[in-house]
């Protein structure tokens, strides 16, 4: 790779996709999607791995252009394998895994997660994973 190409890659913002397994998504999921649209750091694809097409209702999710829904059966669902399958639909540099009831508290979630990858250890070690804290709803 040429030095010019390395510089271009260093200046390019990492692309971010979000993978969300769902089962009977409701109002909280709709709020989650709306908060992902408001993020200060752009989200590429929102990849939804929905269990049981019969429980999917487009109402409330229209107009979200980067929403990619893939349906699977209950028999196909597995916590790890479903997330892995969802990740295969992404070509992003960073993939954020969320649950369908985890609504970001503010518009900085993705920005802060991406920022973690810019950090380096004392000897130049790179961050390979970052996570965010999830707060319970007030009614829990």
Range-by-range predicted roles:
Residues 72, 98-100:
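Catalytic metal- and UDP-sugar-binding loop of GT-A-like glycosyltransferases, i.e.
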Residues 14-17, 45:
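Cell-envelope/extracellular polymer assembly enzymes that use nucleotide-activated donors
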Residues 49-59, 102-103:
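A conserved acidic beta->alpha catalytic loop
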Residues 107-140:
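Conserved donor NDP-sugar-binding/catalytic core segment of glycosyltransferases
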Residues 95:
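Short aromatic/hydrophobic "clamp" motif used to bind/position activated sugar donors
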Residues 43-53, 72:
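Short beta-strand/loop segment that forms part of the nucleotide-sugar
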Residues 73-90:
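Glycine-rich, basic loop-to-helix element that forms the pyrophosphate-binding segment
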Residues 25-38:
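Short, well-formed alpha-helical segments that are part of the catalytic scaffolds
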